[in-house]
From Swiss-Prot:
NCBIfam families: PRK08008.1. Belongs to the ATP-dependent AMP-binding enzyme family. This is Crotonobetaine/carnitine--CoA ligase. Keywords: Ligase. GO terms for molecular function: carnitine-CoA ligase activity; crotonobetaine-CoA ligase activity; medium-chain fatty acid-CoA ligase activity. It catalyses: 4-(trimethylamino)butanoate + ATP + CoA = 4-(trimethylamino)butanoyl-CoA + AMP + diphosphate; crotonobetaine + ATP + CoA = crotonobetainyl-CoA + AMP + diphosphate; (R)-carnitine + ATP + CoA = (R)-carnitinyl-CoA + AMP + diphosphate. Pathway: Amine and polyamine metabolism; carnitine metabolism. It comes from Escherichia coli O139:H28 (strain E24377A / ETEC). It comes from the Bacteria. The lineage of its organism: Bacteria, Pseudomonadati, Pseudomonadota, Gammaproteobacteria, Enterobacterales. Catalyzes the transfer of CoA to carnitine, generating the initial carnitinyl-CoA needed for the CaiB reaction cycle. Also has activity toward crotonobetaine and gamma-butyrobetaine. InterPro entries: AMP-bd_C, AMP-bd_C_sf, AMP-binding_CS, AMP-dep_synth/lig_dom, ANL_N_sf, CaiC. GO terms for biological process: carnitine metabolic process; fatty acid metabolic process. Its EC number is 6.2.1.48. The gene is caiC.
Amino acid sequence: MDIIGGQHLRQMWDDLADVYGHKTALICESSGGVVNRYSYLELNQEINRTANLFYTLGIRKGDKVALHLDNCPEFIFCWFGLAKIGAIMVPINARLLREESAWILQNSQACLLVTSAQFYPMYQQIQQEDATQLRHICLTDVALPADDGVSSFTQLKNQQPATLCYAPPLSTDDTAEILFTSGTTSRPKGVVITHYNLRFAGYYSAWQCALRDDDVYLTVMPAFHIDCQCTAAMAAFSAGATFVLVEKYSARAFWGQAQKYRATITECIPMMIRTLMVQPPSANDRQHRLREVMFYLNLSEQEKDAFCERFGVRLLTSYGMTETIVGIIGDRPGDKRRWPSIGRAGFCYEAEIRDDHNRPLPAGEIGEICIKGVPGKTIFKEYFLNPKATAKVLEADGWLHTGDTGYCDEEGFFYFVDRRCNMIKRGGENVSCVELENIIATHPKIQDIVVVGIKDSIRDEAIKAFVVLNEGETLSEEEFFRFCEQNMAKFKVPSYLEIRKDLPRNCSGKIIRKNLK
């Protein structure tokens, strides 16, 4: 079923400007409280100016341009400005350091970079020490270093006309973006995303939360992440709604921002929910207009109930990954919700559970969650320049192996168990990290938790727990292990405990387990 009909991203923005004109499209709030607003007409003009800027710098269809930016209007300008001229955006996680950023530059073949003064010293070093194809850098800040090959993004953009100067033929099959995965267990892979992928994501995600043009979708998720782009931004723009992009998440500021912008939809990850719950209760906790909170794994039922009760919201569960573009399994608008189910397969998708021999399993049996879509349309096209990795996860007929374990019930509701790589093998038993983390998270002194497997010469793997305590709390090993023994089977009780100030996370809030031993 083709729901796009040849409408690439350039056509989308021209149509949105015509239809919605002076209606507010984008609101950006910086960490310093500076707010920028753009109507659909104004935003399309800024996108055109940015496209013209890239053209004057020699960027043509098929060229790759890297963005290393925090949430800001310039990210949106660049994203769609590049798409309008058929160039390809390569967003870089703003938390990455020199080695990882250089690796993405090298492996994406990016020839131009847009970044800020905050990250510029790192890229100076990369240009001096690493072999990349980078030939120019645009800085979004006003003050510029006196270096060759560096220019002001804002000054160049403001010199451009508001109408597009270069409009090569485009197809919805053209690549719009190469988004490198977070790489929590290995080197990141470049997920190739087409114009069709992004257009479909907008319509699908708008359907998922029943988005209307009078909605306000607020997100604090990073713009370089698939959730912000495909679940939030593309959904809001496709519906003609208002998209609010906050530069940085703050638990203290979040509800005030939701109230100020009269947000009706937002998205949360477990880290956000836990930090919001430790804020002092306020009479304003329920003074908001949120209709849905899009939610991504993983949370205990006790935590979910406490959050919904305190803030008067309901969670709309959505399950997906960079390769699926959107939440391909999730709660449906107007449908029943069955916690802790992650929902049912969305329209245009099939889902099933398979065993280790790639055979479908009946309801109730645990296996790998597999998704069927159309590569380059409803799921990613391929891994950039990595056919071996593509073939490992994507079958020729469109079945995608997620690497996650789960099961489904007789009514087609799916249940997430864990990432396959997060299953601990202990003395012949398979132990789910997520299961243990959900149990341990109910301890009143614990704010954050992750468990990992470490080598054990006798039992294959031992279990180690890393915990972050609530402010002012202390926790003895005796108290911790006694709690575990009272709440889980003996073979699941961790052997080791380490108390830390924080846990290493990537841009989407996922624990970087490879950094924990």
